Amino acid sequence: DKIDPVHYAQKLDIRPWTVQVGGLVNKPTTFDIDDLLKTMPLEERVLRLRCVEAWAMAVPWTGFVFRELLKQVEPKPEATHVRLETFYQPFTAQGQLAFWEPWPYVEGLTIKEAMNELAFLATGIYGHPLPKQHGAPIRLVVPWKYGFKNIKSIVKIELVNYRPATFWNTLQGLEYDFTANVDPRIPHPRWPQTQEKMIDTGDIRPTLPYNGYGDLVAHLYS
């Protein structure tokens, strides 16, 4: 049900909002979201979004390149991965009351993925600030990966020297791979990934490796 998030997300208070960036860095910093909006080099990018459930769309995001934030904290050489964490407010987001699920939502990238030019932190969509249901006030956009990797409402970014445990990979690892690159050759256990349905037109199209961004990211996996 895609209507539920629109309703329930409105309970989330997104001001004040800070993003704590630390771990294996020389300059751990807590950033206020409004300071980031004033100081980071914002740009608009139209990027494809491919859900693991085989629907897709193109989205005009506003935000900045992830590595521009990471440069400010100076990652240490031993950092191999980036762990991202969303808010934990179970009485606001009542799904988080499910004690058998590994809340808060966590995702992770390799440091090479996070430093790639295509990895993006979005603060806006369609020319407006992110709505709460889309991950306000700041979310990850990694368009060569399935949508569940694009963590929303980020509060913490930690550079680590291990592969972090992530929400869906922990919950159902056979269905949700940690790397989760879009790949038509690898089916989901319950459906193929060879095709995708465009959510705006209903058109059925072939799935492209890396969601069409192979020229920019395939070298990360060679």
Predicted regions and their residues:
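Structured, non-membrane catalytic/scaffold regions adjacent to prosthetic-group chemistry
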Residues: 1-222
